């Protein structure tokens, strides 16, 4: 069994690393308490040979000592690889300020800057135990993904991964899109009372939109545009391409168009994913 442990400071990219591992076929568990490592491996034995876990400051106290103890008790056939991700205090402060997420150590009387510094001190012993230390201060998510793949596979898989992401403009535009298409001008199922509670994943909505010549023409034009430029993007060593499709609420039109594009490109040589931001947020 192969076990990958990802640790590091909050905001340094642990979730990005876990997504890469998940794409590589690993069974991923986020923020697993260290004493449960052995139990997890025992439960997955025989069904999952690739396991990845992330640990962070919330699993303290004395995390480094607990980790050493847990690793010493791993089954002898376990092949272990460990990562520690870090970024400068300045970069972490900027990232948290941009996302407005709550830091794990933030309390009513502790500022964000103080929480970031405290976490760095608490995790310093952990950073000295790992196989691979990665400073992500100057890395974007694609650079970090490449580094993780390089370490695990011995080379960077340059197969282009295409992400089609639907979203609603009223909830804000995605920040990491390479291409963004506005489909708010297309016929809107929202005004059909029977379709209003449904989504672009539901057959009645799909049938409604498929009957609209304007919808089919626009999908074809996006497909043609991407097909034209994909070879040039691949020659530029791109690993990821994110195509964002936006409608008003991210429920009907953008979801349908993203799904249709994903189906068309799935027949090619690329890895293709369809993600629906607002639908996922509604489930959370």
Curated annotation (Swiss-Prot):
Annotated PANTHER family: RNASE ADAPTER PROTEIN RAPZ (PTHR30448:SF0)
GO molecular function: ATP binding; GTP binding
HAMAP family: RapZ_like
Family statement: Belongs to the RapZ-like family.
Record carries keyword Calcium: no
Domain of life (superkingdom): Bacteria
Function text: Displays ATPase and GTPase activities.
Residue sites binding ATP per the record: 8-15
Binding of GTP, residues: 56-59
InterPro entries xref list: P-loop_NTPase, RapZ-like, RapZ-like_N, RapZ_C
NCBIfam families assigned to the protein according to its UniProt record, in alphabetical order: PRK05416.1
Keywords: ATP-binding, GTP-binding, Nucleotide-binding
Name assigned to this protein: Nucleotide-binding protein Sbal195_0713
ATP-binding is among the record's keywords: yes
Species: Shewanella baltica (strain OS195)
Classification via Pfam families: PapZ_C (PF22740), RapZ-like_N (PF03668)
């Amino acid at each position: 069994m192969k076990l990958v442990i990802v640790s590091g400071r909050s905001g340094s990219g642990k979730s990005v690393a876990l997504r890469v591992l998940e794409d590589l076929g690993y069974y991923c568990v986020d923020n697993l308490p260290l004493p449960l490592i052995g139990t997890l491996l025992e439960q997955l034995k025989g069904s999952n040979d690739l396991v990845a876990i992330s640990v962070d400051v919330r699993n303290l106290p004395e995390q480094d000592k607990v980790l050493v103890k847990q690793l010493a008790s791993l089954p002898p056939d376990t092949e272990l690889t460990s990562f520690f991700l870090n970024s400068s205090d300045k970069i972490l402060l900027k990232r948290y300020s941009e996302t407005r997420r709550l830091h794990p150590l933030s309390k009513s009387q502790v500022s964000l800057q103080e929480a970031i510094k405290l976490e760095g001190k608490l995790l310093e012993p952990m950073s000295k135990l790992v196989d691979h230390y990665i400073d992500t201060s100057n890395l974007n998510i694609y650079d970090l993904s490449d580094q993780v793949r390089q370490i695990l596979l011995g080379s960077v898989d340059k197969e282009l991964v295409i992400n089609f992401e639907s979203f609603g403009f009223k909830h804000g535009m995605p920040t990491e899109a390479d291409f963004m298409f506005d489909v708010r001008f297309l016929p809107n199922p929202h005004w059909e009372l029977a379709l209003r509670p449904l989504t672009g994943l539901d057959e009645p909505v799909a049938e409604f939109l498929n009957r609209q010549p304007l919808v089919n023409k626009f999908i074809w034009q996006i497909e043609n545009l991407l097909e034209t430029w994909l070879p040039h993007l691949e020659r530029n060593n791109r690993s990821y391409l994110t195509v964002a499709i936006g409608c008003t609420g991210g429920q009907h039109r953008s979801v349908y168009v993203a799904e249709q594009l994903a189906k068309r490109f799935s027949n090619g040589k690329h890895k293709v994913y369809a993600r629906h931001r607002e639908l996922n947020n509604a489930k959370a």
